[in-house]
Amino acid sequence: MIKLVILWTKVIVLALIALLFSSCNGNVEFGNGIDGNGNVKTENRTPAEKFTKIENSRGLALTVEQSSAISVEVEADENLLKHIIIKVDNGTLVVTTDEDMDDYTTRKVTVKMPVIEKLSVDSGASIATVNTLTGASLKLHSDSGSELIVKAEYDAIDADCSSGSLQKLSGKSLKLTLQADSGSNLEAKKLLSNAVIATSSSGSSVSVHPLVSLNANASSGASIDYVNEPKQIKKDESSGGSINKS
């Protein structure tokens, strides 16, 4: 009975991932969106309002650099620039589009900011850090086939990853809290952390590098791998979940 449940879980997760990736906006011709004209231009979109968080969506590629200077630049086909929306909402820099875009040369957003408290990405979009981010507390969120690549050194890092999305984390932290579900992949084996709390479910995979303690919970065909044996470890495996040293 358990094997049957695991099998159906994996089938559902794979179907979900296929649906998500087929619906993500990318450099693919679907026929319903706007085509770029091939004439690439760059615009300065630095807002007047302050922000410490970023939310990126709808297939856009964004890089973020921690810097004393504040700037936002958008590079894209000239006729697509007006459809790339940059605004600040309650301290969050929101990056999105108001139209679907099919065939284009590039759609890049470059952000520089001094304080970074949260990075969020969904709907096939991506965020990558240029340098090592530092601070007290950092929240990371990825969803719906998106990608988040972050190098950071914070006291506390809290990351959640779902619906076929991918996170690759590196750096250092005192406390690391991770949650992955619905066929997502959270790679944090290059992020050294004193205390790690990791939860993985529904066919997801998590990798970690705990130094002092690890509290791990894996269920429904999901896995958690740890690359270092911590001084304290607590494992909770259920419904085909696995927790192993790699």
Where do the protein language model's features map onto the residues?
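Intrinsically disordered, low-complexity terminal regions
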Residues: 1-181, 185-246
